[in-house]
Amino acid sequence: MGNHMNKHIAALTVACLAATSANAAGLPERVKSAGKVVVANQPNYPPMEYVDPATNELKGVDIDLGVALAKELGTTVEWSNISFEQMISSLQTGRVDLIHSGMSDLPKRRDTLDFIDYMKSGAQFYTSFARKDEFKTLTDFCGKTVGMSRRTSFPDETAKWSAANCEAKGLPAIKVVGTEGSADARAQLKQGRLDAAVQGSETLPYLMDLEKDTYAVVGEPFTVVYQGIGFAKKDTELRDAYAAALKGLMESGEYKAIFAKYGLEGTLLDGIHINGEAVK
């Protein structure tokens, strides 16, 4: 069922990508008449989205990409600051047109959303700079207290990794602590209440540059996931317009330039992906 549905989506999207005149003509009537797309975003996940303390302006990869996509489509963006937990319900009730806020394209979310994927990410262990010598390999985290945002997929993914790599080998399980967000996990790490934390791999270089000699990444990401722009299942017209717009940005080089600005060239995707599958 899932594969059949993805093939159906891919076929629809191929048709839209063939006509890459990604302009307002491909947008739903409601967006054309409004002259804007209303986008759910919570700016608390640098460098993906954050508020610049100096100017109070929104900044980040998602912000730059969202503005560029809207421009490609001949419209504008109205960012709607919505808590992560409320984003999907806000989309379903029509309060927003789409979600663009560092959201992982997870199979369980595809029951209610279609995703246009735009970057690779992964769950990454890190610890405090002062304790970096204690953790040489990922199994050194077995039996340790590790924090991560409870609103993300990281707690489940970390528990799964622990079961396969700690408990299955006779090592103590990781003690997974769900925190109020990634900033809370970092605060608890600094206070010594956590031995380590887990966060999206795309955010850590930015944080390590911002707070030098504070954190240390250990090993490689232990999951691979795509970040995606989320659309209501019924909103195929808007989804396909955005897929065409993203293809246009990829071909012009603007997509790559946005990610290069934040040092995230390693997270780029090669071509359009819908719900985790490449669209030819």
Please provide the spans of the model-predicted regions.
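Periplasmic-binding protein-like
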Residues: 43, 120-127, 209-246, 265-280
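Extracytoplasmic small-molecule ligand-binding "clamshell" domains
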Residues: 25-102, 252, 261
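Ligand-binding cleft/hinge of the Venus flytrap
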Residues: 67-73, 154-178, 208-212
